[in-house]
Design a protein with these regions (language model features):
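An anion-binding loop in the catalytic cleft
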Residues: 7-108
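Flexible, acidic loop-helix segments that line cofactor/substrate-binding pockets
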Residues: 1-6
Length: 108
């Protein structure tokens, strides 16, 4: 199970993107938001020099989630799944969980 878990501190955005693609759809890579296990089904690495701390969640100007990674890069989350829910876009997640998304919220 540990090979399916995303390690934001030790993996680059490109490595995490490849892991998510490789494990989709049968297994799904995952991360934690607090106590909740979140499955990640699609994402894309962004090639910018970000000052975003690994694991830190930010909302981009399009309203999608981006997460800081090891290489000072960002990974844009495209689709994800909360426990017991259907797969949704990160934009839907942002709209539905806006109250949960506070400053300095991190995936672990």
């Amino acid at each position: 199970n540990t090979f399916k878990r995303v390690d934001w501190v030790c993996q680059t955005a490109g490595e995490i993107e490849n892991k998510i693609r490789a494990l989709n759809p049968k297994y799904g890579a995952f991360t934690y938001l607090g106590e909740e296990r979140i499955k990640l089904f699609s994402a894309s690495a962004k090639k910018n020099n970000s000052s975003v701390e690994p694991g830190l969640i930010v909302i981009n100007k399009e309203g999608s989630l981006e997460v800081g990674c090891k290489d000072s890069g960002l990974l844009e989350i495209e689709t994800l799944q909360m426990p017991g829910k259907r797969i949704i876009s990160s934009k839907e997640f942002v709209r539905g969980y806006k109250s949960t998304l506070s400053k300095n919220l991190k995936f672990s």
